């Protein structure tokens, strides 16, 4: 089969050898897929934890299910394994600093970015909020996919924060 015009082959060919593909090439290829940015929050006792996640997706409309994929080495992974609930805050275009903060990147000091909804922490001013009860967790590769049933949803009218090819972009960029 001929390669579609305009595509550059980085690896592979007739005898595809996945061992030849390195993580950087894989990440670069996936970087061509624009994603929204979320902060996944959870509570452990009186402590609130949050982690920046762009591996977020809807799974089902009936019942309403979403999934987040969390690296098993992340502190948030251990916390999610101890709880039965998580929040998803879809970040707006004005919240890049919060994405960086929860990704452990250098960011300006963040002063209490959370609001409480039904006693659960969510990022203040986000594009949308979900509160989910964990239905199932699947360990796959070096991540765990946490599937949650949506119990609360709220939406604000603003533009999303997007990530494409290793940088933040806006709609129309």
Regions found by a protein language model. Give the residues of each.
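Basic, polyanion-binding surface patches
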Residues: 4-173
């Amino acid at each position: 089969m001929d390669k579609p015009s305009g595509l550059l082959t980085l690896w592979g060919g007739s005898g595809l050898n996945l061992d030849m593909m390195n993580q950087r090439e894989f990440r670069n290829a996936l970087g061509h897929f624009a994603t929204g940015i979320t902060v996944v929050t959870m509570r452990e006792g009186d402590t609130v934890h949050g982690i920046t996640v762009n591996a977020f997706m809807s799974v089902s409309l009936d019942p309403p299910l979403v999934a987040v994929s969390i690296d098993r080495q992340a502190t948030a992974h251990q916390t999610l394994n101890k709880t039965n609930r998580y929040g998803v805050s879809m970040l707006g275009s004005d919240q890049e600093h919060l994405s960086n903060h929860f990704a452990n990147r250098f960011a300006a000091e963040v002063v209490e970015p959370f609001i409480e909804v039904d006693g659960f922490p969510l990022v203040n001013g986000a594009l949308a909020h979900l509160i989910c009860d964990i239905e199932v967790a699947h360990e796959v590769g070096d991540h765990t996919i946490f599937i949650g049933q949506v119990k609360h949803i709220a939406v604000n009218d603003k533009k999303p924060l997007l990530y494409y090819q290793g940088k933040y972009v806006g709609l129309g960029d």
